Amino acid sequence: MSEISQYTEGLHEECGVFGIYDKTGETDMVSAVYSALYALQHRGQESCGIALNVDGVLSGHRDLGLVSEVFTKRVLEELPHGAKMATGHVRYATAGQRSRSNAQPMILHHCKGAMALCHNGNLVNAPKLRRKLEMSGSIFHGTSDTEVIAYLLTQNRLLTPNIEMAVSRTMDDIEGAYSLVIMTHTKLIAARDPHGFRPLCIGELPDGSGYAFASESCALDAVGAKFLRDVRPGEIVIADHTGLRSMDSHCGTAPHTICVFEYIYFARPDSVVEGTCVHEARLQAGRFLAQEHPVEADVVIGAPDSGLDAALGYAQESGIPYGIGFIKNKYVGRTFIQGSQKQRENSVRIKLNAIEATVKGKRVVLVDDSIVRGTTSARTIRLLREAGAKEVHYRISAPPFAHPCYFGTDIPDEKQLIATGHTVEEINKLVGSDTLGYLSIEHVQQLAIHSHCGFCTGCFTGRYPVDPPAETMDIVYDKPLSVSNPSKKL
């Protein structure tokens, strides 16, 4: 499998955002956000943070690490209590380096009041905006595109009568994927880009005492909030003492194209995204996969965790018995969202163990959600061979990843994708399976069972709803600023 090593570098991000407002002040905000971030931990494992609003004063804590590592009992006890509003964030970096300065929420202080900002997504015009802001005097402390949004918000707040108008004006400036939660001294605001690339939903607290915004509905469940609806693409939603209200000036300005990978991999199975339960969508993907790529076999198993639902769907459609083929070490993070390639390879070695009783001497259908680099796939198939599987037929509930993502998913460079420049048969040989079948793009586009939204499928097709950036933020970090008179000393 030595050929695979050249396709095992790259890939980056996903984030989770959360905000909660309780006009009565009876909700324990520290406990609520802590619980919500646990529910969203699968969306980012590099850093996390909580910001609280106590009597109009914003403060918080953020650091590198998992929620359980950053928010120890001591830290939780030292956070201010009595807040009526709070925000939280989990991060895995796509735009910006892995550092504490890039952790969120970002708390901003300016002459019209403080605000805390949480962002999920990627801006395609962040390099251009950052350079413009630096030329106007802005000093950046981190390397993420969220800081670009922060500076634009503070500038626009000086030019507008209220924060929601500043958010609207900022949305005029930024392009790409963004689901935002913003907290001021009196308001909690959610905003979503006009394409709706990343999910964002609204929940109501018990007894109608307030509202919550979250990347996924599972976080609403964690705090006992009732799911109301998704934030519409382009919508700004404001929660304050008057209730809930909406601004829709950016709604309908672009086609709705949520990232299809939310259904395939990122979102938790119990979450409802755009009206469709993620578990149900993955079951349907497995059924479609069985229709497209049937095979004679003895057992169907899934690659934990996001391949399990599709495997069950494949078994239901094909009539082949479903089995549990692997035991997963729950204390090793997901390989797809860990920082370096060496970390990923080490975690693959200790992450899974095949159950010999399920696969020995059998023809196995292994269902997985994707093949990105190929490292994990090859190792997983090798585990099945070592456990005695007679045949391994690999089935993928997504089309081949052959193109980078610019909107907040961990796929940055075509050179790092095994599907780039290789046929399906070549990939089959590289990962070591007997046969390989991918789900078609036509069936992928039917996974939003209970909604009429479209999908961004750029990582499969190379066709994007928004033009890709001409340069990345990584280039901007190292590029010196140009000035009109280079010889003049500043």
Question: How should these model regions be labeled?
Answer:
Residues 1-233, 238-297, 303, 391, ...:
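Conserved short alpha-helical segments that host acidic/polar catalytic motifs at enzyme active sites
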Residues 171, 186, 224-230, 251, ...:
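PRPP-dependent phosphoribosyltransferase catalytic core
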Residues 319-364, 375, 402-408, 412:
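Short, glycine/charge-rich flexible loops or terminal/linker lids adjacent to PRPP-binding catalytic cores
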Residues 169, 218-219, 226, 234-235, ...:
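Phosphate/diphosphate-binding loops
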Residues 138, 159-160, 294-298, 316-323, ...:
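Secondary-structure transition/capping motifs at alpha-helix termini
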Residues 94-95, 125, 189, 197-198, ...:
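Flexible loop/turn segments at secondary-structure boundaries
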Residues 118, 183, 191-192, 203, ...:
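Generic beta-strand/beta-sheet core signal
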Residues 142, 147-150, 322-333, 430-448:
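A conserved beta-strand->alpha-helix junction
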